[in-house]
């Protein structure tokens, strides 16, 4: 399982969401609305002698903070478990990421803020577990 292939696969899945800018590498200054695919943390050899590895990573979804209400409403549509704007549904639309892994699962989404330079965004941090 190569990190670059996993990131590229996640980017392709997330690009199915209309209007979403997707970064497979952490940008200096993102343009919202955006999904940023983070770096992978690996656990090797879960199943004897190179049989299975596990990677965990975050995808941060952020929106511009125009006002609290409008920013939160924009962000909430991405949190839905299904539908055209669902981050979870988009990520899990191809569980093998075009062969980059065996399977994956979105395990959680945590609300927060994301800062880049002088700009603060509203965000959700999606935790993903990938096996391969």
Where are these regions (language model features)?
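Charged, amphipathic alpha-helical segments and their flanking helix caps
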Residues: 1-31, 41-132
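Two-metal-ion RNase H-like nuclease active-site motif
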Residues: 37
